[in-house]
Amino acid sequence: MNSSIAILLVMALIMFSLDKSYSTDDESGNKCAKTKRRENVCRVCGNRSGNDEYYSECCESDYRYHRCLDLLRN
């Protein structure tokens, strides 16, 4: 009886840790909320482009973010 409870507790801990690690990847895709640097870079590129959607595209897409970094370096 005690060994089955111990096994259930271990399984519950494993499931909880897996659920917690996957739930952080399931956010809305806004990576600007995670890092202040990315938010600032995307804001500058959005202001320079004059395109209202550029900021949100930069926050969601790694390709757009790296392209923005390249534009700011030049």
Swiss-Prot record:
Its main location: secreted. Expressed by the venom gland. Keywords: Disulfide bond, Ion channel impairing toxin, Neurotoxin, Potassium channel impairing toxin, Secreted, Signal, Toxin, Voltage-gated potassium channel impairing toxin. The keyword Secreted applies. One of its GO terms (molecular function) is potassium channel regulator activity. It is found in: Secreted. Residues 1-23 form the signal peptide. This toxin inhibits voltage-gated potassium channel currents in DRG neurons (IC(50)=44.2 nM). In vivo, insects injected with this toxin showed signs of neurotoxicity including twitching, paralysis, and body contraction. Belongs to the scoloptoxin-03 family. This is Kappa-scoloptoxin(03)-Ssm1a. It comes from Scolopendra mutilans.
